[in-house]
Design a protein with these regions (language model features):
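Canonical Rossmann dinucleotide-binding motif of NAD(H)/NADP(H)-dependent dehydrogenases/reductases
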Residues: 16-47
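Short C-terminal tail/terminal secondary-structure segment
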Residues: 111-113, 164, 242, 253-281
Length: 281
């Protein structure tokens, strides 16, 4: 029968990712880690970014142990100078940049969901900085390098929270929705340079963050309200990222792809204040 290396080689050729140079931001754990690993399996050389050196180095080591090429690049993506230095390092050590997957972005510590009237300036500033601003800084630095190379593909990981009202989570949902709109503007501007820009929005995914934030009762309620009666898995999102950044999607740009097991279709999804382990009132 066919061996796994042979199958992966065929996949790499088919997807057009063989020998591509890739940066994956926010790839030290969870969804970002899985995306970095799948892109490497498809034949790419991957730069793994995370704020924590131990996590970036661990994922890069996993990829290397699997027989692919990877380096760790540590940077705080809220710092424009650090982002520029990170992208320059990727270009120098890998040889260029063809694909960028920006998974960096989160709900900052201490900014847990709360009623809209309890959001203050510092909350808005931190949440927008950690989600919209980091996306813009990374996207700009990546696009500049891709323009020099004659094209590329940029993918942003946003959130299913941008597709419906998100009570008690207004700031995060608004920041992620802004990234979706940023994608359309970038796609129009960068298209003539051969650069595609897209976003994918995961539904509730079983990550360490979700496990820590939601009670078992809330997670059960979310599953029950989802048409497919399940949460999204890391590897499903990773495979979608491979598709969107590959040659199979070379006519797709400026798009926002929802991957939520059908949660968007449900009208009975629990509000964000139901089942949180941390109090918001």
């Amino acid at each position: 029968g066919r061996t796994m290396p042979f199958i992966l080689l065929r996949m790499a050729v088919y997807f057009g990712i063989t020998f591509a140079y890739i940066i994956a931001t926010g790839a030290g754990a969870g969804i970002g880690r899985e995306i970095a690993r799948w892109l490497a399996r498809a034949g790419a050389s991957v730069a793994v970014n995370d704020l924590r050196p131990d996590r970036a180095e661990a994922v890069a080591a996993e990829i290397t142990d699997d027989g692919s090429t990877a380096i760790a690049v540590v940077a705080d993506c809220r710092d424009e100078t650090a982002v520029d230095a990170m992208v320059a390092t990727v270009a120098d050590r890998l040889g260029g940049l063809d694909i960028a997957v920006n998974n960096v972005g989160m709900l900052p510590p201490g900014r847990q969901p709360r009623p809209f009237v309890r959001y203050r300036y510092d909350d808005w500033h931190d949440i927008i900085d950690q989600n919209l601003v980091v996306a813009a800084l990374c996207g700009r630095a990546e696009a500049e390098l891709m323009i020099e190379r004659g094209g590329g593909s940029i993918l942003f990981v946003t959130s299913g929270e941008t597709t419906r009202p998100s009570p008690y989570n207004a700031a995060y949902a608004a920041a992620k929705a802004a990234v979706n709109h940023l994608v359309t503007s970038m796609a129009v501007e960068l298209g003539p340079a051969g650069i595609r820009v897209n976003a994918m929005a995961p539904g509730t995914t079983m990550t360490e963050t979700v496990a820590a934030a939601f009670t078992p009762e809330r997670m059960a309620a979310i599953v029950e309200a989802t048409p497919l009666r399940r949460m999204v898995e890391h590897d499903e999102l990773a495979r979608l990222a491979v598709f969107l950044t590959s040659d199979l999607a070379r006519c797709i740009t400026g798009q926002f792809l929802l991957a939520d097991a059908g949660a968007f279709l449900s009208r009975s999804r629990p509000a964000n204040d139901e089942g949180l382990t941390s109090p918001i009132r």
